[in-house]
Amino acid sequence: MKKLVIRLCFFIIPVMIYAGACVFVDAYNVFHVDNVRLTDITPNQNFIKTKYLLQNKGKFNALLLGSSRVANLPKEGLPEKTDDGRELNWYNMTYAMGSASENYDTVKTLIDGGVKLDELIILIDDVSMWKGVTKGLDNPIFTTYQTYEESPIRFYYSYLKLKPVWRIVPQIFFEYRLGENNEGKKLFYSYGVDVNNTNMEIGSAGDMPEPENSLEYDGGSGAVGAIKDLSELCKEQNIRLIVVTSPILESTYEMAISNGYLDFLYDAAQVTDYYLFSGINTYTVGPEYYFDASHFRPVVGLEMEKVMFGDEDVRNMAVEKAKNDMSLVEFGHLVTKENSVDVIENLEQEINELNRK
């Protein structure tokens, strides 16, 4: 018996040490929802942010939803109050490759969990048109909160099985040393974005980057259905929903169109109105307004907010500022079911004129 106990100790102790190391290193931060460590590995923000809001139900009543691009809508340009005078506290639920279908699931989970929401902004783009819900436990960055709900034990075990990323340990200790002076962590918990997403500078002009790849739009992602479901849910819950499209850099925009992006925009207009910032304008033809081939800079996001939330003079100035000699659809034009055919035809004409130059 004594030998058996000794053997078990030799087995159990190393396993416990290894499990403890996995929990400590925790590259994707699923064990550190209340104390994220901002390393060079992308955390599982879908899970972290959803759990954070459920643990702090009264802290935020207004959310931004979408892919990583929506991180570049600055907090200072958002409405401070509802139409009837209630204060709005905004949190950005942005995460890499966030899809409309996942966003709907997130909102439903939050409402069911007792989070009171008054306003939502959802940004749709060329990722939305093909990206559906991430299923299963195979991708630690993208595993959803809903997968966790199905089986918390399986969820956490899937992360314990991952080999610890030892190279980030110095970064973790650096984070701990910052303590209360960690501005990145404060920003994450107050608005859900990275420090880079507050940089209001315009970049350097240069050559047009190679396009960001997109996949073909065939309706399989369920994006349009999810947008419709979200719209109906918001009506039921008396939540103001604002749908907005991303301004997409010219090279990436052309590839998106070749994969059916304009069809997606038309289909989306059949289920909800939205502000259109995709198209040819001052920003989408200027690489200096983008961090890369995918992400517009916050300075563009602020102009978008002026169009959506500014008074008439501010809005008109922002629209005029974005206009160039190829623009046929104004920056932030409100697309509806009734005008969608004309808008899509103008977008097609824009891109055809651009290609002839």
Please identify what each model-predicted range represents.
Residues 201-286:
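Flexible, glycine-rich surface segments
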Residues 41-66:
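Short extracytoplasmic
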Residues 123-124, 133-237, 321-357:
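Secreted/periplasmic serine-hydrolase-like ester/acetyl group-modifying domain
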Residues 69-155:
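Membrane-embedded segments
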Residues 25-48:
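Alpha-helical transmembrane signal-anchor/signal-peptide segments
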Residues 6-26:
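Hydrophobic membrane-insertion alpha-helices, especially the h-region
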Residues 43-50, 100-108, 225:
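N-terminal post-signal-peptidase region of extra-cytosolic proteins
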Residues 257-357:
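C-terminal regions of proteins
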